[in-house]
């Protein structure tokens, strides 16, 4: 029992390597003047992501487009890998998500204080704050700034883990109810299918939300 619980927190390195290789396999570089449907879908998807993530940026902020697109595709594909049978999503590991959130957040903070020092400091004190509240507001805003990478990682971990656990519990209940009644099996099976579809949507939405928040942090500093 203890070994099973400890195995839950093991990082699946093999799955991560598969996730890293997936973009190169699924999103090949076009080498023909007239592309096929798969390349057309790829280009449409990338343009859609760029439009959603980079619409708020100026020309200087557009230099981050490749990083944001890569981040979105990596997290999305990693989340989807966790839905395969006998697999485990690396994004359910808080350490994996922190290893992405902390460097990206640190980069946005460093850029902000380097290129927009006054504006970055002004974010710590909202305009119109009463004088007697200034020390407390500065402390609150500083804490809010420092916990950004933690909230990024915890949000992604919690959403992916909750969905996987819900599917696992519902699937276990379906196996238990196999010998009870045919109608019960049918209802449970439909529930599992609906939860799986919902988890597919959550996997893609959480990848988008993670990249969108990084894009907003970059917008404040770039």
Swiss-Prot record:
Reaction catalysis annotation: H(+)(in) = H(+)(out)
Tell me the keywords, alphabetical order.
ATP synthesis, CF(0), Hydrogen ion transport, Ion transport, Membrane, Mitochondrion, Mitochondrion inner membrane, Transmembrane, Transmembrane helix, Transport
Q: What is its main location?
A: mitochondrion
How is this protein positioned relative to the membrane?
Multi-pass membrane protein
Indicate the transmembrane segments per the record.
7-27, 64-84, 93-113, 132-152, 160-180, 197-219
> Which BP terms from GO are recorded?
proton motive force-driven ATP synthesis; proton transmembrane transport
- Tagged with keyword Membrane: yes
PROSITE patterns recorded: ATPASE_A
Tell me the InterPro entries matching this sequence.
ATP_synth_F0_asu, ATP_synth_F0_asu_AS, ATP_synth_F0_asu_bact/mt, F0_ATP_A_sf
Q: Name one GO cellular component term.
A: mitochondrial inner membrane
Which molecular function GO terms apply here? proton channel activity; proton-transporting ATP synthase activity, rotational mechanism
Q: Where in the cell is it found?
A: Mitochondrion inner membrane
The record's function comment reads: Subunit a, of the mitochondrial membrane ATP synthase complex (F(1)F(0) ATP synthase or Complex V) that produces ATP from ADP in the presence of a proton gradient across the membrane which is generated by electron transport complexes of the respiratory chain. ATP synthase complex consist of a soluble F(1) head domain - the catalytic core - and a membrane F(1) domain - the membrane proton channel. These two domains are linked by a central stalk rotating inside the F(1) region and a stationary peripheral stalk.
Family of this protein: Belongs to the ATPase A chain family.
Give the multimer and partner information. Component of the ATP synthase complex composed at least of ATP5F1A/subunit alpha, ATP5F1B/subunit beta, ATP5MC1/subunit c (homooctomer), MT-ATP6/subunit a, MT-ATP8/subunit 8, ATP5ME/subunit e, ATP5MF/subunit f, ATP5MG/subunit g, ATP5MK/subunit k, ATP5MJ/subunit j, ATP5F1C/subunit gamma, ATP5F1D/subunit delta, ATP5F1E/subunit epsilon, ATP5PF/subunit F6, ATP5PB/subunit b, ATP5PD/subunit d, ATP5PO/subunit OSCP.
Name this protein carries in UniProt: ATP synthase F(0) complex subunit a
